[in-house]
Design a protein with these regions (language model features):
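Short gly/pro/ser/thr-enriched loop/turn and capping motifs at secondary-structure boundaries
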Residues: 84-86, 107-108, 141, 167-172
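A cross-family acyltransferase "interaction/gating" segment
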Residues: 143-204
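Residue-level preference for the first positions of well-ordered beta-strands
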Residues: 51-55, 74, 128-132
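C-terminal functional extensions of proteins
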Residues: 195, 202-226
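Catalytic-site beta-strand/loop segments enriched in glycine and acidic/polar residues
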Residues: 118-152, 156
Length: 273
């Protein structure tokens, strides 16, 4: 990208237009989709111990506004300091959520940004805001929780709640997290897992156990979310990368989703989706 194009891409006009389009598209997906919840009262479970720490996988991050928090509930979300994240930050703010800036590019900047993000997350939780973040982060590996979320729970004393938002129709992008672009006119599943609490005075062993529990909890709720998207007797169309559709099976077995879950979900599932 040339300097001129980079400057244009990071301009206030492009950021404003891009975030407005992103907000419109996400609202369009939500409003044209049939929402199913597990448990039925997801708000009650999500906010029973407010403020909490919402955890999700990066690949299923797009539909986080579908959680639809109560009007008087403050939610903060971490966003990278990288210039490319400005549209994302503005989009989140358009949904009435607070933004906490995380790490930027480069190792030293990432280290400084990570410490600043942790301080910002602690301040948000102390102020009474539920804090949402992806347990995995670029450049990966995908679906491997970092120790930071366990440390945040320890320092704040707040529980971690695994969440998943998935649609049965989507495009999986060819990115490090296989980020899913959710499509309109879908079945949108919102699944909330059980809270994970870090023991008081936890050491490195307990923090690692918490990290593994977050991974397991997120894999479970994500599998359940895609399982709720089943439809019978439909053709199966999967996307290996953006704009590269390929037919994987002519006809699906009854009871499965018309758009299958991502390959990593299917390979980790204990039950057939």
């Amino acid at each position: 990208m040339t300097a001129t194009l980079r400057k244009l891409y990071h301009s206030n006009v492009v950021t404003a237009v891009g975030s407005a389009l992103a907000e419109f598209y996400i609202r369009f997906v939500i409003r044209t989709s049939r929402v199913v919840r597990d448990p039925p009262d997801t708000d009650g479970k999500l906010f029973s111990q407010h403020p909490q720490i919402f955890a999700m996988w990066h690949g299923q991050f797009m539909m986080v506004p579908a959680i639809r928090p109560q009007a008087d509930t403050d939610i903060a979300i971490i966003v990278s300091r990288h210039g490319d994240a400005e549209i994302l930050a503005n989009t989140i703010q358009r949904f009435g959520m607070r933004v906490v800036r995380g790490a930027g590019a480069g190792r030293r900047r990432k280290d400084r940004g990570g410490a600043a993000a942790l301080r910002g997350a602690l301040r948000a939780l102390k102020d009474g805001a539920t804090f949402a973040l992806t347990a995995d982060a670029p450049p990966g590996p995908a679906r491997k929780a970092g120790i930071g979320i366990a440390l945040l729970a320890k320092l704040s004393g707040r529980p971690i709640v695994p969440c998943a938002m998935a649609t049965n129709r989507y495009v999986a992008l060819n990115s490090w997290s296989a980020f899913t672009l959710n499509l309109p006119f879908s079945k949108l599943a919102i699944v909330v897992g059980d809270p994970i609490v870090v023991p008081e005075g936890a050491g490195s062993i307990e923090l690692e156990a918490t990290r593994l529990a977050v991974e397991q909890g997120l894999n479970e709720v994500t599998q359940r979310a895609y399982g709720l998207g089943r439809r019978e007797g439909s053709s199966r169309l999967s996307y290996a990368a953006w704009g590269t559709p390929k037919r994987s099976d002519a006809v699906m077995a009854p009871g499965r989703a018309d758009y299958p879950a991502p390959a990593w979900v299917r390979s980790n599932a204990t039950n057939t989706l």
